Amino acid sequence: MITLRPLLLLVAFISFSGCATNLHSSASATTPTATYQPGELNGETLFDILSAELAANQDHYDYTLKKYLKQAELTRDPNLAKRAASIAQYLRDTQALSKAVKLWIIADPSEPEPRQILANILITQGKFTEALPHFKTALDQGQGKALLLITSQLGKMSDTEVTSYIELLEAVDIDASLNNDRLVSLGILQRHLKQYDLALQNFNRALKSSADLPNALYQKAETLKSLNRYTEALSTVQLLLADAADDRQYNALEIQLLFLLKKNKQGIAKIDLLITKNENDVPLQNYLALTALDFNQLDKSKSILEKLLRSSPINSSPYFYLGIIAERNDQPLQAIENYLQVDSGSNLLQAHPRAISLHKKSADKKKVENITEQLIASHKENQTTYLLMLADWLNKFEFRQDAISLLDKNIQLQDENPALLYTRAMYLEPVDSPAAERDFKRVLALTPENAVALNAYGYTLTVHTNRYQEALTLIERALTLPPKAPATIDSMGWVLYKLKRYEEAIRYLSQAYLLYDDPEVASHLIAALAGNNDLERARQLFIKISNSPPDNKFVEQARQSLESK
């Protein structure tokens, strides 16, 4: 293997010497014609590195990266690969960085740093299975940074992927200096899978080795909380607070535990103390208000939220939570007023529908229409959401024709709005299935991969026509797309029942019922069981759903399925 470190030093010297010659574009540069000889320091390598460093001296880093990647690949020199990786990191070019570190690993398999970098890249990209061998090699070579990264990505990992990392961490022969980090990471992964007892064992093993590991203590406290061992959890977090009294994470956990232990006065006192110490910290005060709300400490939550509104009237977000408090206090008019005062932020489209939903009488129709009109005028960007909100309210209170007329009017203005078309189709389906079918077709012309519309159209065909094979094709397509909702699985079972493919129907309908034990799904499963002459299971399921309201039409349909046998 050639060693280019002296050449890199020479190039660095030339770069810092302030060469005044401007770098020509790559198109105008003339590359030496010498034939490249792998493993030798030849003219092409020298020319590329010199031109790359001169380019870097003039901030042309893309050119520099291109040349270093080329020569790293040709020479298999680890120093060139490392330089390419460094430039790619500076440019935040993940694709180039992946290529550079892979070349670096090939050039120097014993070097741990590129393994660490590659593991980090793959983990960040969510390629957890692909990252696993590099993660292991990095640990074997004493690189522990990936432990922190993998625990930070748990929300993106499947249970199978988490299990693979648990098995690796249980088996890996790791440097003693990293063992406590391994145990804590292992415990965090196990806690994610709700393996609380195993997680607790690993946190305790780490603490036995070093009694003052903050992360191990904190994770232990959280695990004890998950096991409902609140007193032990409180004692553990208070050990942390003895050395870090102002740590927000520790204080937040202590407050939760105080409320869980019904020590409400102490919890409120702790909230007051934190607010006094952090009078200008709006995010902290907002968090404390929501914590109080979570534990139904409504008066305390309300007082903090009202204080936040006084200090910053322009921020309307607290009104959303004041609306929730008013609802819990059985004050619907106050709740409506609060919800409607939310005029921006992430809760806007939760607040306004909640305000509408609190109008619980058909006599409120004019009021609801006026509110919706005002909301559309104030928030034109959310017009579709508000129209659907109003249509849903009208349909719920048996103003179906008014809901359809509302959608007709707005579809004339927005004839390519799939949400309006889909909603009208759903309202038309019970009363005018051909019109509903036309709308479903328009929705699918606009959004061909719309799994919800594919399912709804397919199910409509099973209910109103005998075009079962066409319905099956639509529902099969829906099942290949996300989300694989229980409703789609139910539709698949139902169309198979219509096709008299009873055993297949039972498999799908049983799966749907496990996911969503609704009387409609149950009635479909009972029909399929009866069709397959499995009357005992059908009767047992009917007994289970017969406690539904006596006028439930699906219970009656299930009864008819049994009586027909």
List where the protein language model places each region.
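Disordered, low-complexity tails and leader-like regions
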Residues: 3, 25-27, 104
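Alpha-solenoid helical repeat scaffolds
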Residues: 21, 36-57, 66-565
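Bacterial N-terminal signal peptides that target proteins for export
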Residues: 1-8
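Short, low-complexity, disordered segments immediately C-terminal to signal peptides
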Residues: 24-34
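C-terminal motif of bacterial Sec signal peptides marking the signal peptidase cleavage site
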Residues: 17-18
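Flanking scaffold residues of small Cys/His-coordinated metal-binding clusters
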Residues: 11
